[in-house]
Amino acid sequence: MEWGPGKTAQGRARLPSSRPREKPQLSCNLCGDAAHQPRVTTQDRIRHLESLVFDLMQQSSVTQGQHGGGTPFSPVGSARFPVNTAVATTGTDSGSMRSTGGGANYVVSSHWAAVLDGIAELKDHLDSEDEAVHSDVHGVESPTAEITGPQLLYGCPKPASKDEILASILSLSRPVVDRLVSRYFNSFEMSPAVLHSVEFLKEYEEFWDDPSSVSPLWLGLLFTIMCLATQFEKFRLDPGVQSPAALSMERDLQKMADAYKLRIGQCLVLGNYTKGGPYVLETLMLYIAAEVFSSTDAEIDIWILTGNTVQIALHMGYHRDPKHFKGMSSFAAEMRRRVWATLIEMDLGLSAQMGLPRMIKQWQTDTQEPSNLQDSDFDKATVEMPPSRPETELTPILYRLVKARLMTTVGYIWDFAADVRPYTYTEVERMDSKLDEARKSIPDCLKWHSFARCITDSPQIIMQKVVLETLVYRAKIILHRKFMLGPPENSADSKRIVLESALKLLDYQHMLQEESQPFCQLYQERWRVSSLVNHDFLLATSILCYYLQNTKREGMPVSESTPMDETIMVSLRRSYDIWLQSSDSSKEARKVVKALNVVLGVSNTSGTDSGLDSSMSSSVPSGCASSTINDYQSGVEIPAGLGSQFPVLDGAMMPNWATFADDLLAAPMATPSNEWQAMDAAETVDTMGSLAWPWNLQCHALAEKVNDESLD
């Protein structure tokens, strides 16, 4: 059957409506049955309409590119490339909009949710579920609905005086708070970018000498440290131990963290934080980090709070380099540079997670990058800053410095993705070259080689290396996705780069799953994974699903599938089990499981197994790292080894799943495989036994007290 402009659904030429009928029709003869006319389904009509819209958008975009449409300003260099005027355009260039029970959700076209929306075969599943969910909640407002996300956005439930806040801290013994502060500085890799450890400890001693002398905002900063440290302890609990003592411990730690977050909001309000001032940005940034750790999925509230933080930073002049301001100390200037670099990273990461344009543009700021210095190299008494240490020396701040440098290029790429104007393949080549240069500039002490070469590294360093690598792969996908199915002269390279990058990201996901198992190298650091991290893997999964479904739509017989297609199928099958294990606690994981059910043809009728048929299961090796990607020569310099990713606020750059239905399809969901759970069940060791909690009763009492106050 041939469809197209001027054709009927059966492929015949359409007669003009003005054609006169030569004689009246006085009778009709019964026609015989059409010879095996194919049935035109609703799905066929959807595809036909999509193809027409796609053709029209291509024509419109090319016209704009030729007549003043222009391409986005690219301030990342002037390398000479042969001019290629092919314009990046796909059927989802305008992004994706979905109505929800509470309004509408929009994401840019490079967001994983928009990618899945572009798969016609998923439309019926996703849309029908949307309608079912929304019809249940339409016009119904729960009187007992809890506020989720940062309470600071909605006002504190009960304002508190400084004396009340002080009393809640002083009710704890100092050793209790000391342990929490120690846990924070020894666990959180973002701490040197926000707080100067030497100066903070001086202020900490002054607080215990005279508690009433500190400001409410400094108290808020202390509570953010205590909150994050408590979350870190909770995340370290063994999920395989479900004894009453373990469950009680988890509940107590969650109550403590919630109590501390309530106090943070009270301190910020009491300190009139919107006016700015000392400790405001540091407290807000750590508060945002605590909220990110509390959420299993992307939350719009956190992004909005980040926007407020950016506005306060602009109001305080952080976007301008301190050299413009006379009288500012060397110490203050260096710390402002550290805070601003970290805020840029948070803005980009959370904006990309939500699938929305970032708030800080590079052309709006001239703040220089911070120096590679230990905290012991300078303090408030420093008059002239020492020279930056060489980047062969791995200081606590070096990772943030290197990542901020890489994020400059990644930020421009995200601006491309969020720009409403089309861009040319020449711009893609230029940006891709800049990205490769930025990757090559990563110091060797933070450069990923292979997991085997990381056996002497700390888990934190391993994850830092992998994060920098995955940042590049994410950016490659975002940059080349629009040309993936574009003009033949450009699509081959872009398709290869996108597929190899997506496969590599899923290899990292698989390694993450393996190395975070008991007795493996990253087991004690598995808590570092956040909702931001999973968006890298969501994008990789959705882009591979999109590719496979488009291959099917092109009519390629199964017997003609390429080795790359087989590699993709194996990788997606392994990821399916990982997503399935997370689906109980994550709506985003449930959504991608539904998509994979359709793409992989997974039976969803059984509630006793993972849903993979025997042929699929047999093709996935159990308990070993995926090596299929290494069988291919990569155009993006894929390293030989694999690794896993557990960044803290390191998901910078990948889109969100927020536009899908909360629950996809009414069919019962398959349960995860028993292998991982059985291994945990066989282990009877209570890992909490080695954790002495002499301070638990005091912290629990504080949590109960604060919760009672909030209900008064």
From Swiss-Prot:
Keyword Zinc: yes
GO biological process: DNA-templated transcription
Disulfide bonds: none
Domain of life, source organism: Eukaryota
Gene Ontology CC entries for this record: nucleus
Phenotype on disruption: Resulted in the down-regulation of the three biosynthetic genes from the trisetin cluster and a reduced accumulation of trichosetin, and blocks the expression of the cluster-specific MFS transporter MFS-T.
Stated role: Transcription factor that regulates the expression of the gene cluster that mediates the biosynthesis of trichosetin, a trans-fused decalin-containing tetramic acid with antimicrobial activity. Plays a specific role in the induction of the cluster-specific MFS transporter MFS-T and thus regulates the detoxification of the toxic trichosetin in Gibberella fujikuroi cells.
Protein name: Trichosetin biosynthesis cluster transcription factor TF23
Protein source organism: Gibberella fujikuroi (strain CBS 195.34 / IMI 58289 / NRRL A-6831) (Bakanae and foot rot disease fungus)
Lineage summary: Eukaryota, Fungi, Dikarya, Ascomycota, Pezizomycotina
